[in-house]
Design a protein with these regions (language model features):
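Charge-rich, low-complexity N-terminal segments
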Residues: 1-111
């Protein structure tokens, strides 16, 4: 899914990313289940989109997330937010991609 959002990064070094700037993020969510539900799905994509797109699209990520919104942290947040999600890929621009994978979503690291 595509998200239009702005952020500024809090980094330990000088970077232009410390200033407010925006991206058209592409977020890919990977879900799994031992068995499909009664509808033949792992989960409804609409529920995933509502949980992510509904919260992040056209927002200031620093304000809505409450943590340093690096692509890596956003990917981890998605994995923690969607119970069936085990991996998330966040692309903030072409060539700038972060992937977070949890081998056991229930025990994903806390932010």
């Amino acid at each position: 899914m595509e998200i239009a959002a702005c952020h500024r990064l809090q980094l330990s070094y000088d970077s232009p990313c410390g200033g407010l700037h925006g991206h058209n993020w592409i977020i890919t969510v990977y879900c799994k289940a031992k068995k499909l539900n009664a509808d033949g799905m792992v989960c409804d994509f609409k529920h995933i989109k509502n949980a992510i797109h509904g919260k992040l699209d056209h927002s200031n990520l620093n304000e809505v997330l409450g943590f340093n919104p690096t692509a890596e942290n956003i990917a981890r947040w998605v994995v923690q937010r969607i119970p069936q999600c085990y991996k998330c890929k966040v692309q903030e621009s072409e060539g700038n991609v972060a992937i977070y994978t949890s081998h056991n979503n229930a025990q994903a690291d806390e932010l």
